[in-house]
Amino acid sequence: MSPMARTAPVPAATDPAIIRNFCIIAHIDHGKSTLADRMLQYTGVVKQRDMKAQYLDRMDIERERGITIKSQAVRMPWELDGNSYALNMIDTPGHVDFTYEVSRSLAACEGAVLLVDAAQGIEAQTLANLYLAMENNLTIIPVLNKIDLPAAQPEKYAAELANLIGGDPEDVLKVSGKTGVGVEALLDKIVRDLPAPVGDPNAPARAMIFDSVYDTYRGVVTYVRVVDGMLHPRERIQMMSTRATHELLEIGVSSPEPTPSKGLGVGEVGYLITGVKDVRQSKVGDTVTNLAKPASESLSGYADAKPMVFSGLYPLDGTDYPVLRDALEKLMLNDAALVYEPETSAALGFGFRVGFLGLLHLEITRERLEREYNLDLISTAPNVEYEVTLEDKKVIHVTNPSEYPTGKISEVREPMVSATILAPNEFVGSIMELCQSRRGQMRGMDYLSEDRVELRYWIPLAEIVFDFFDLLKSKTRGYASLDWKADGEQVADLVKVDILLQGEQVDAFSAITHRDKAYAYGVMMTGKLRELIPRQQFEVPIQAAIGSRIIARESIRAIRKDVLAKCYGGDITRKRKLLEKQKEGKKRMKMVGRVEVPQEAFIAALTTDESKDKAKK
């Protein structure tokens, strides 16, 4: 068995020289959580009988989807050459939506284990996280995982990794998180190669928050990394960005179950409990200091998480509105990036406009609402935030098509992203075609090896939030991977397309789209509604319009009764009289008639295909 530390170093009395803080960065599905499981087992912090797969992923959704959403920090003892060391492993999310959380986790470390699947090679998020690690000046240990797979090509990818970060292919460690091969060698290498944390134990306390989780019984549990000074229980602490003060009720380390300690010293990673009930009180990236002896300046790199994608969430059953409100409030306790405000739609009733970090964040939030609170929800098509400047120089921020101003508009700005796409080189043509059709501008292209290409595009966020990723996967047989980050904005020719039913606007179907795509959207939506709305006694025109200009039209034909059925033969004038009378009646009906759009039509027209399948079940 492994050389576990016989006497684990005690928190608060640990010399920073024997501490090693590291995180594991990898693309989704490259075996990060499995490797973490093996480390927990080999260092002896989790007993063999308590071991379960993905030990650190606590949420059901995390386990089911096999993704990590919240960061976790674990303290593990390890012994090398007769000396005991304390290793702090910080598990990070791998998905692009949670990049800010990853960057804060990286800032809490001195080193990173760059994990790459030996059967799949380097992917877009591996690169994105690697660049983040390099920006934070971390020491990087390259590791190939899953070498037990029959499809593994360790030699090929070791050369690719060495080429990417500089170094020798021989230095790339080969491990298997599943069987445990090479994990001890990796732990030894972490102790040997990673630098110890540096800080001043006598300076005022400064600790960086890299995650905060809401616990039903204890309130908010804040995970911190101490940079300078010491933190002790029962002290009063202050958050430097909000200036809020709290009493430290409990302080300790996770290994991996929470273990209270007498304090935390320089370089140590642990948790704080202050009894606060709202996660927004302890923001990721903020600095914690001692109220009695506060630090003069906070640690750099703090930023507010900014929502990128907005969507309306409406309960199918209007009476569930209060339940949805409470559910969103509770989720906000655990997710500082979630923002919402109430909104009403003439068509869908009362609901909320919710802001998310990205599509995965939207999907997970919606799934948690449906699963944990038994809600049935309709979500409208995702939108981004546009900045509309009117001719009188007034600026309006629009996240919902119904807020789009009708007056004279001088310009509309839309958010842009830098997208990095990695794919085998045979798909370059179809990827370029897709990006150009989405108004992307090419920024560069590099060959990582003879058969893998990195494409860089500057592309509007609105074009990638809906179905871009699905199309990219289908065009590349699932081989491409995508990573993006917000990158400025541009002036664009955007218009609001309204859908009119018998001359009346239906707010739920309006969309903000590029002028070139407006016609296609109008034709698609009018066609869809023609199929979905039941026929009436009179003809119903469905029109798509930009302002007052109609760009597309479909008609739902009237149902008519055969008024001539009772005439057997007889004079033509008699028949004409009956037909004229029917025509008059239809005309009158059309003047006063209202078209009721059934709920099913709304759901079918608004949902993407994936949620449609859900609705069928």
Curated annotation (Swiss-Prot):
Domain tr-type G: 17-198
One Gene Ontology CC term in the entry: plasma membrane
PROSITE patterns: G_TR_1, G_TR_2
Molecular-function annotations in GO: GTP binding; GTPase activity; ribosome binding; translation elongation factor activity
GO process terms (BP): positive regulation of translation
EC class name: hydrolase
Location relative to the cell: Cell membrane
Topology versus the membrane: Peripheral membrane protein
EC id: 3.6.5.n1
Catalysed reaction equations from the record: GTP + H2O = GDP + phosphate + H(+)
Gene3D superfamilies assigned: 3.30.70.240, Elongation factor 4, C-terminal domain, Elongation Factor G (Translational Gtpase), domain 3, P-loop containing nucleotide triphosphate hydrolases, Translation factors
Entry keywords, A to Z: Cell membrane, GTP-binding, Hydrolase, Membrane, Nucleotide-binding, Protein biosynthesis
Pfam families, alphabetized: EFG_C, GTP_EFTU, GTP_EFTU_D2, LepA_C
Binding positions for GTP per the UniProt entry: 29-34, 145-148
Chief location bin: membrane
Hydrolase as UniProt keyword: yes
Reported function: Required for accurate and efficient protein synthesis under certain stress conditions. May act as a fidelity factor of the translation reaction, by catalyzing a one-codon backward translocation of tRNAs on improperly translocated ribosomes. Back-translocation proceeds from a post-translocation (POST) complex to a pre-translocation (PRE) complex, thus giving elongation factor G a second chance to translocate the tRNAs correctly. Binds to ribosomes in a GTP-dependent manner.
PANTHER family attached to this UniProt entry: TRANSLATION FACTOR GUF1 HOMOLOG, CHLOROPLASTIC, TRANSLATION FACTOR GUF1-RELATED
Family, per entry: Belongs to the TRAFAC class translation factor GTPase superfamily. Classic translation factor GTPase family. LepA subfamily.
The protein's name in its UniProt record: Elongation factor 4
Gene behind this protein: lepA
